[in-house]
Amino acid sequence: MSTSITNDFETRRYRLTDVARAGDAATRTPIYSTESTSGVVWVLKPGQEIKPHGHAKADDIWICIQGEGVFYPAPGEERPIAKGDVIVSAKGMCHGMKNTGTEDFIFVGILAPVPAD
């Protein structure tokens, strides 16, 4: 699920309480997009996941804000992640995650360059 891009370049500030939304599946809310990068806020309820995938032309950086889960650095491989962690996946590298905790898992994703694929 995805909503519209905010692109609030007047204040250049986004409040998680205003943009973080949970849904029936992992929910991606775009907050900005420029010619070179894009930023999103992801919310995963307990048990929800982002399947392992990669981007042919872009790096993807995840800044973990809340919760705990497992990161998929490769299909079939898991590593624990939690609030305060930063995940860096260079172009072509596999990444995905699952919320294994009891609260929503929230992270900010920065993708560059765009388009990613």
For the regions a language model picked out, list residue spans one by one.
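A short hydrophobic beta-strand segment most commonly corresponding to one strand
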Residues: 41, 103-117
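Short, conserved beta-strand element in jelly-roll/cupin
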Residues: 43-45, 56-71, 110
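Conserved short histidine dyad/triad with adjacent acidic residue
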Residues: 25, 40-55, 91
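A short, N-terminal "cap"/entry segment at the start of jelly-roll beta-barrel domains
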Residues: 1-38, 51
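Short acidic-glycine-tyrosine-enriched beta hairpin
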Residues: 75-91
